[in-house]
Amino acid sequence: EFLFHHGLPSEESQYRSYRKLLEWAGAKPVTIRTLDAGGDKPLPGLEQPAESNPFLGLRGLRLSLRQPEVFRTQLRALCRAAVHGNLKVMVPMVTVPDELHSTRELLEDVCAELTAEDIEFHKPVLGMMVEVPAAALAPELFTDAAFFSIGSNDLVQYLTASSRDLHHVADLADPGHPAVLRVIRELVEHCDCSGQELSLCGDMGSDPNFIAQ
């Protein structure tokens, strides 16, 4: 939705897109990731600082929390669209629990705002992506995340300290590295105990060879 616009999409534009997707899915759950700009995903119309290493800078949820009006607009559209299906919302690039708490507070504000405006809405379930090692190694800190989704591309990049946009170190960004597999295995074990849902996205999610590992 964001990446295919020449500028920032309006609340109505986002609402229509989300609603169309949810109505198509019917009763099936639909997970929508909030704005994940920055790094390898620059976004026209959004002010982003020049950074020497954007993969470690202001991207994902970090950027959304610095642009609260943009984030609020998306959350309003998501809450309105949630009336039309089974919506889950996940936030990317989470490092510390305070970021998730701030998101939840903003979501509550948006719900209160929509109530005051007498606009129909439903508060979606809120989860997070696990791609930053600090979050991957300490999932017990995120007790209020309804679910986790492992962002394997970034997790591999950060665990191997190998930028995935540089071909001369691409061979080091190995998803089969024992450290990567260990972190994912420990996340699975944590979620088995905590009851939190866990899914896998990114390139590893399309490779059946990793299922047995």
Predicted regions and their residues:
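Conserved alpha/beta-domain cores
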Residues: 1-213
